[in-house]
């Protein structure tokens, strides 16, 4: 991927949701909600503080994260649908 986010931005690839309920009902693609989890593919260097020093991000490449349904800006890179969002749009890191 030839994309390097700036500042406190993070590039996330959405993870696929289950398309079948626990009782075995298959949910069609057009009825399924967009997943609110993704994998961090790239991170920016971080925000700058008042003195011009970078404040490192709390997330790292490879983290599985939770974010809001409408978080981020969708972009298409090398045929992949990705999200570019600020770190503050990420609600949590999922521990594996």
Swiss-Prot record:
GO BP term (any one): chaperone cofactor-dependent protein refolding
Signal sequence region: none
Keyword check for Iron: no
GO annotations of cellular component type: cytoplasm
Family matches, as Pfam families: Cpn10
Record keywords: Chaperone, Cytoplasm
Subcellular location: Cytoplasm
Keyword Secreted: no
Molecular function per GO: ATP binding; metal ion binding; protein folding chaperone; protein-folding chaperone binding; unfolded protein binding
Main location group: cytoplasm
Subunit description: Heptamer of 7 subunits arranged in a ring. Interacts with the chaperonin GroEL.
Role: Together with the chaperonin GroEL, plays an essential role in assisting protein folding. The GroEL-GroES system forms a nano-cage that allows encapsulation of the non-native substrate proteins and provides a physical environment optimized to promote and accelerate protein folding. GroES binds to the apical surface of the GroEL ring, thereby capping the opening of the GroEL channel.
Family that this chain belongs to: Belongs to the GroES chaperonin family.
Protein name listed in UniProt: Co-chaperonin GroES
């Amino acid at each position: 991927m030839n994309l390097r986010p700036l500042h406190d931005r993070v590039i996330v690839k959405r993870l696929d949701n289950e398309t079948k309920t626990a009782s075995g009902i298959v949910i069609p693609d057009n009825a399924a909600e967009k997943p609110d989890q993704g994998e961090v593919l790239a991170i920016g260097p971080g925000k700058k503080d008042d003195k011009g020093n970078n404040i490192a991000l709390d997330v790292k490449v490879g983290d599985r994260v939770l974010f809001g349904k409408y978080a981020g800006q969708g972009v298409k890179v090398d045929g992949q649908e990705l999200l570019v969002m600020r770190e503050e749009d990420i609600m949590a890191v999922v521990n594996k």
